[in-house]
């Protein structure tokens, strides 16, 4: 069996979806990932297919999780951000193949209407990733995420903080 420290990171993308009021989309995670039910909210994220461009992967994941296509790209964090999952769940998460994720993050402006968001029947017939959603002030995000992902969210919020108050078209 592969030692935890020798496992690779899963290559993924994350998307901060910001509405016209500067609020950020968060979804309540479905499934068993949660260690503590207090921290079940997160932004859309997901895996990058082999050979797939990260920006295209981010748009695909956003659509597959929310049905959203009405976006304008605002920013990208140039670095890959990583987190490790707790050892206690490493054998179950991703069938024990990864120790965590390395993520490329993007911020986008949502230019559609809220009724475009459909987490119950997301794009391309994918299984729902979220059971509920809401708009949150950016500064609240780190308190909503599961603790082992918090350092990534702290960096994402720091990098994209100037976008929180930016209005569409400015």
UniProtKB/Swiss-Prot annotation:
InterPro entries: NUDIX_hydrolase-like_dom_sf (IPR015797), NUDIX_hydrolase_dom (IPR000086), RppH (IPR022927). Residues 8-158 form the Nudix hydrolase domain. Belongs to the Nudix hydrolase family. RppH subfamily. Accelerates the degradation of transcripts by removing pyrophosphate from the 5'-end of triphosphorylated RNA, leading to a more labile monophosphorylated state that can stimulate subsequent ribonuclease cleavage. One of its GO terms (biological process) is nucleoside phosphate metabolic process. Gene3D superfamilies: Nucleoside Triphosphate Pyrophosphohydrolase. SUPFAM superfamilies: Nudix. This is RNA pyrophosphohydrolase. The gene is rppH.
């Amino acid at each position: 069996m592969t030692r935890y420290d020798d496992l690779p990171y899963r290559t993924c993308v994350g998307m901060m979806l910001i509405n016209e009021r500067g609020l950020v989309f968060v979804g309540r995670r479905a499934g068993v990932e949660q260690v503590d039910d207090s921290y079940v909210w997160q932004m859309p994220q997901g895996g990058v297919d082999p050979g797939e461009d990260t920006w295209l992967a981010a748009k695909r994941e956003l659509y597959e999780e929310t049905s959203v296509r009405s976006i304008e790209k605002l920013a990208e964090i140039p670095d890959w951000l990583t987190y490790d999952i707790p050892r206690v769940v490493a054998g179950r998460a991703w069938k024990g193949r990864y120790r965590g994720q390395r993520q490329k993050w993007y911020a986008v402006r949502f230019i559609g209407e809220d009724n475009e968001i459909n987490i119950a029947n997301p794009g391309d017939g994918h299984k729902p990733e979220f059971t509920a959603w809401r708009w949150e002030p950016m500064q609240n995000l780190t308190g909503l995420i599961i603790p082992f992902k918090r350092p990534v969210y702290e960096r994402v919020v720091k990098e994209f903080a100037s976008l929180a108050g930016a209005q569409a078209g400015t």
